[in-house]
Amino acid sequence: MSTTAWQKCLGLLQDEFSAQQFNTWLRPLQAYMDEQRLILLAPNRFVVDWVRKHFFSRIEELIKQFSGDDIKAISIEVGSKPVEAVDTPAETIVTSSSTAPLKSAPKKAVDYKSSHLNKKFVFDSFVEGNSNQLARAASMQVAERPGDAYNPLFIYGGVGLGKTHLMHAIGNSILKNNPEAKVLYLHSERFVADMVKALQTNSINEFKRFYRSLNALLIDDIQFFAGKDRSQEEFFHTFNALLEGQQQIILTSDRYPKEIEGMEERLKSRFGWGLTVAVEPPELETRVAILISKAEQSNIELPYEVAFFIAKRIRSNVRELEGALRRVIANAHFTGKPITIEFVHEALRDLLALQDKLVTIENIQKTVAEYYKVKVADLLSKRRSRSIARPRQMAMALSKELTNHSLPEIGDHFGGKDHTTVIHACRKVKELIQDDSDFAEDYKNLMRILSS
């Protein structure tokens, strides 16, 4: 029996949940039929438990809707479908004891000694919230059981949300538990630079031996490998060697692995072998906690109402939040004035003005209305003519894409529409982008306008 019902179920779940939730928990699931039982396969126990707790009842409901009596039972367990054998022959690394003639000595050996870890980035200084709870929990599991818990661990999310902090925290924890461990943190561009240097100095075997001898390899911004075929080839073999030796790999990216254009499919597939978790923009309470925690680290007493004021106005990411706090502390230090809401408003005048221009549902509605030459009131109305329905659907889809609002909240902003109306709008926009080149161009133009 086919798994068509599961594919239909996935299509609806993708519309109902955020991209981060869908990509982290639902997209990695594989399905197969055993007589009249649908079996979902998850990459590890962590995913199994989370799906059971948060998504399973909805999955059962949708499967019953799409399959009728064809599927009698649904279960989820750890496992994976068989994967094709690697089609790349194993590499032979020439060692110093080889009978092959020695190459000329490198002009200058690459410095591999430092772990490049920032000792300030530890789990204790990472403020936990709903937006990063899962990523932090998974990171702590990896730190406690490197090479065993989730391998590789792939953390993705926007700029300044704490991915690098978690990566350093894992590395520091591994070294604390085992000072003899060989741990290396680096940006993906450093890996490329090391490889190029090794090629230039005829020391590629030394490069391979070093990277494949690590106990933990932590690579930041893996998306920069995109389009670099030789680097991807070398990393592919390094990845395989480390996993075969049960050594830990931790990767970060600004997007879900399957969405990294220019990355080989075999690499993207391997990125999903362990656990993929998202770090989302922090909610208000977490932003307040971050500000108070950072102020305490600087021996500054930050009034709660001031922290709340800053957190409410600066919503994009942790990095900008910390930057704003540093500016406030510096201004207070140089002027000798107490930190009050009025003082903060003056110290952050330009930054707050910029934040006020960030995308909101109201901004989206206004921009879409102007683009299509209709009134905002039309978008909020119940009118169903195509000239109004299309812009309304576009505005709803853009609101889901560009804001952190839930589907019910988006519906409320459009004249109290039901969340199912928003789901339908998002699905319709996705179809039109594929089938209508003019509509697709409109979507690109509006995304560019709203993102600039």
Curated annotation (Swiss-Prot):
Taxonomic superkingdom: Bacteria
A single MF term (Gene Ontology): ATP binding
Protein name (database record): Chromosomal replication initiator protein DnaA
Compartments in which it is found: Cytoplasm
Task of the protein: Plays an essential role in the initiation and regulation of chromosomal replication. ATP-DnaA binds to the origin of replication (oriC) to initiate formation of the DNA replication initiation complex once per cell cycle. Binds the DnaA box (a 9 base pair repeat at the origin) and separates the double-stranded (ds)DNA. Forms a right-handed helical filament on oriC DNA; dsDNA binds to the exterior of the filament while single-stranded (ss)DNA is stabiized in the filament's interior.
Protein family: Belongs to the DnaA family.
UniProt comment concerning the protein's domains: Domain I is involved in oligomerization and binding regulators, domain II is flexibile and of varying length in different bacteria, domain III forms the AAA+ region, while domain IV binds dsDNA.
Annotated PROSITE patterns: DNAA
Subunit note: Oligomerizes as a right-handed, spiral filament on DNA at oriC.
Domain IV, binds dsDNA: annotated span: 333-452
Binding site for ATP: 160, 162-164
GO biological process, one term: regulation of DNA replication
Ranges for region Domain II: 85-115
Record region (Domain I, interacts with DnaA modulators): 1-85
Keywords from the named record: ATP-binding, Cytoplasm, DNA replication, DNA-binding, Lipid-binding, Nucleotide-binding
HAMAP family according to UniProt: DnaA_bact
Region (Domain III, AAA+ region): 116-332
Entries under InterPro entries matching the protein: AAA+_ATPase, Chromosome_initiator_DnaA, Chromosome_initiator_DnaA-like, Chromosome_initiator_DnaA_CS, DnaA_C, DnaA_dom, DnaA_N_dom, DnaA_N_sf
Species this chain originates from: Legionella pneumophila subsp. pneumophila (strain Philadelphia 1 / ATCC 33152 / DSM 7513)
GO CC annotations on file: cytoplasm; plasma membrane
